[in-house]
């Protein structure tokens, strides 16, 4: 009888991927990147082992939203003081720090535990096409732009 093989933390080998976010929808990009960060694209996925890969996202400021979300979508946070609710539209957030848009979208798709925190550290988002990880020789990760088109 065959036994199910479980990998251990020392058996993981992490690859580096690079994604160009130019003209990619934020939500579709975030879901596919979150799967790679978790390692669910691998055959030997194990829920309790962090065997996800590193992902570098370039041109984060050129990612797009569908519909009118650019002006109608808001990010909320609260200072925990009375009257401390703050809100910021996507337009304003893009001007202040465009990388936070993708970072937040991807972070909220990862598990809300220690494992998710470790997987989130493997995400590297940059404005423009320059990044300091050329020495890792990242492979290009193709992100589908159509609904239902997974590569």
Swiss-Prot record:
Belongs to the universal ribosomal protein uL13 family. The gene is rplM. Pfam families: Ribosomal_L13. Part of the 50S ribosomal subunit. HAMAP family: Ribosomal_uL13. InterPro entries: Ribosomal_uL13, Ribosomal_uL13_bac-type, Ribosomal_uL13_sf. GO terms for cellular component: cytosolic large ribosomal subunit. SUPFAM superfamilies: Ribosomal protein L13. PANTHER family: LARGE RIBOSOMAL SUBUNIT PROTEIN UL13M (PTHR11545:SF2), RIBOSOMAL PROTEIN L13 (PTHR11545). The lineage of its organism: Bacteria, Bacillati, Mycoplasmatota, Mollicutes, Mycoplasmataceae. NCBIfam families: rplM_bact. It comes from Mycoplasma mycoides subsp. mycoides SC (strain CCUG 32753 / NCTC 10114 / PG1). GO terms for molecular function: mRNA binding; structural constituent of ribosome. Keywords: Ribonucleoprotein, Ribosomal protein. This protein is one of the early assembly proteins of the 50S ribosomal subunit, although it is not seen to bind rRNA by itself. It is important during the early stages of 50S assembly. This is Large ribosomal subunit protein uL13. GO terms for biological process: negative regulation of translation; translation.
């Amino acid at each position: 009888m065959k036994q199910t093989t479980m990998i251990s933390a020392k058996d993981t080998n992490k690859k580096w991927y690079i994604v160009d976010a130019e003209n990619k929808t934020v939500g579709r990009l975030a879901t596919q990147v979150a799967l790679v960060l978790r390692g669910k694209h691998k055959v030997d996925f194990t829920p309790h082992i962090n065997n996800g890969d590193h992902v570098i996202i370039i041109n984060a400021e050129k990612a797009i939203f569908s519909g009118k979300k650019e002006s109608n979508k808001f990010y909320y946070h609260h200072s925990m003081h009375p009257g401390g609710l703050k809100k910021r539209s996507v337009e304003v957030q893009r001007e202040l720090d465009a990388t936070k848009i993708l970072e937040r979208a991807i972070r909220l798709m990862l598990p809300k535990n220690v494992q998710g925190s470790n997987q989130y550290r493997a995400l590297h988002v940059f404005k423009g096409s320059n990044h300091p990880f050329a020495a890792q020789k990242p492979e290009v990760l193709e992100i589908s732009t159509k609904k239902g088109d997974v590569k």
